[in-house]
Amino acid sequence: MKPTVWHHLRLCPHGHPDETIDDAAIAVDETGTIVWLGAFSALPHGYAHWQREDLHGAWVTPGLVDCHTHLVYGGTRADEFAQRLAGVSYEEIARQGGGIVSTVRATRAADETTLFVQAAARLQPLLAEGVSAIEIKSGYGLDLASERKMLRVARQLGERFPVSVYTTFLGAHALPPEYAGRADAYIDEVCERMLPTLADEGLVDAVDVFCERIGFSLAQTERVFEAATRRGLPVKLHAEQLSNAGGTALAARYRALSADHLEFLDEAGVEAMKAAGTVAVLLPGAYYFIRETQLPPIELLRKHGVPIALATDHNPGTSPLESLLLTLNMGCTLFRMTVPEVLQGVTRHAAAALGRADRHGALEIGRQADFAVWSVGSLAELAYWIGRPLCEQVVRGGATVFRRMNG
């Protein structure tokens, strides 16, 4: 790759629309590393003979980060959509053997190739919206072989597509049918066999649990956290989505990277998150799709200065969402977040939720040149338009990996 100066651009280096540089330039060396950025008029003479890329006044932001997804799974759950419209609750569907467990059956039945092809089709719309880093959870296998299969597919997506994939082991997502009535025995399997084996195989970057009355108890969640800590793996948590179970305070005790959903989070939980440096990951797609009415405590999170991230929560049952830009709009319209909040929520704060704030979510000297080029007049348009293709170009490591074709 030739050293290149990207110029005639409007730069938002940290995802905050109030911190921008008009008529900016970014100098990227042959390794794909940013070696200079700032006002084009101040470009050092040493870069005068480098190759030039004129962006014609387009906006440039860091590559976006989708920090909570369940992208790898078999089948769909379209049939449950009609049930919910008829008034059946998500919890009741789960008790009837639907919900997560129905996806477990489909995922176990699918081979790796099938799972890869299906997940790749879900990933590509996100990449076309400027996503350069994504988290992918397991949790639809619920046995060692199937969880391994999911995590292997997630790793393969990162190898085959221009995106950084971070894997999360979510073995404690639901109770598999063969362990009905034996939740503690299943947690034994998760902690003593599944997690150690998959971690030793290099398939796990973090560990998550679904802590809820239809999921796992605080005591069971803590056992998984202890097992992850022994392996030196960071933890995160699905918490307070359907009730205030106290999971967020537990997550904070283990200095979790993030606590996610949080509709029923109280002020004590918010204070614990702030003290621990835990990021609040809000998932408006799930809130919208299952027609929740309890809003997450945005004002409390603001009051205590807890960083807020947004993610698609792409999954087959509660958020079949393949657009991080639509997530921005939902964050504004449903959760009453501001444009600066939602933009930082898919850049620097989303990177922090993955424990990767040093690699993603900002454009700085010394970092890899991962950025998105936007055909908008203002950054507010990223959260304003619904369904319009706004991403003109995606650059990863200084190389263009996506360019929208016009006409």
Swiss-Prot record:
Entry keyword annotation includes Hydrolase:
yes
EC code: 3.5.2.7
What gene is it encoded by? hutI
Any Pfam family hit: Amidohydro_1
Write out the residues that bind 4-imidazolone-5-propanoate.
77, 140, 173, 241, 318
Q: Which organism is it from?
A: Burkholderia ambifaria (strain MC40-6)
Record's subcellular location: Cytoplasm
The name this protein goes by in its record: Imidazolonepropionase
Keyword Hydrolase applies: yes
Q: Where does N-formimidoyl-L-glutamate bind?
A: 140, 315, 317
Give the record's pathway. Amino-acid degradation; L-histidine degradation into L-glutamate; N-formimidoyl-L-glutamate from L-histidine: step 3/3
What is the reaction catalyzed? 4-imidazolone-5-propanoate + H2O = N-formimidoyl-L-glutamate
